[in-house]
């Protein structure tokens, strides 16, 4: 039997990173013919520097146009399933699936209600985002979540449990090892190297960068700890940073850069789902100091076993200083973290779960299609 032909929404940049959307797309391409559906107007719609009313109007028009174009493309290419990466694109995918009579899959990166509360969004935003999540969750044929906690949050919204499937954000450990190669920490006894990385359009990452500059770096300086803090990733803002911080921008071989650091820091205090940067760092075997919220989605992480975990912003700089002063202890902790990723968060473990789900949906074994809710 031929594997199902998939319409993947939206088209994403396949840049070799461990980010969930391109990673999932690469997995799907291994066994399926995948047609990607571009969403060129997203750049304007989600540009918060632009006026709100025109963006909202464009959003409504764009969803309608995308649905029409998607149906045409789906008919032309004979798709057998839609696979969508955000709630806004899942809305389009659901319409396409209903019209063409094919199953719809939504790969949720985090529950909207939990995310809104975590990031301090207003009541109106929280209500609308939660309503869209609930609407989609009750109507798509399968809702993939990145963690059990997210699945439970959707179930509390009224999403039927049989539509929920937990497939954690993972990494390809073999690829990580190949990319990281023989990189060794570039720091010395006199000056250590720290790293933080991510996309700075994501508000929690931007807040983390400010925290590193305003609180972590000055604390280490006061303690007499000499270090350089590498800051990598897309969309680095123009802002005054502590002199010990060295912006390096987007790095293609990020795993080699992570392994070359003595310590990775993740002071994320809001957000949902599994942070790719955490799994990436654990896979490289680089020691990690992280905030308690950054452990969300990876319940196996234990403080002092897989990482040093700060329960408050005040505690975070203290743990970083402790980690830098105890490299042998951190080396052991990093080894535990890598073994956890190898056992639970390698895509080779998750890929069969994804394939099994798609097979059941397209052969009718996954339940009746187009159920209302």
Regions found by a protein language model. Name each.
Residues 1-43:
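N-terminal subdomain of nucleotide-sugar transferases
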Residues 17-27, 173-175, 187-247, 251-254, ...:
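Conserved catalytic-core segment of nucleotide-activated headgroup transferases in glycan assembly
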Residues 64, 68-75, 91, 95-99, ...:
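Membrane-proximal helix-turn-helix segments that form the acceptor-binding/catalytic region
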Residues 149, 167-170:
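Carbohydrate-associated surface elements
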Residues 155, 170-190, 364:
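Acidic anion/phosphate-binding donor-loop and adjacent secondary structure
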Residues 259-273, 284-287:
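Acidic donor-binding loop of glycosyltransferase active sites
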Residues 277, 287-292:
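Short hydrophobic beta-strand element within catalytic cores of glycosyltransferases
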Residues 329-344, 350-353:
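A short, well-ordered alpha-helix in the C-terminal region of glycosyltransferases
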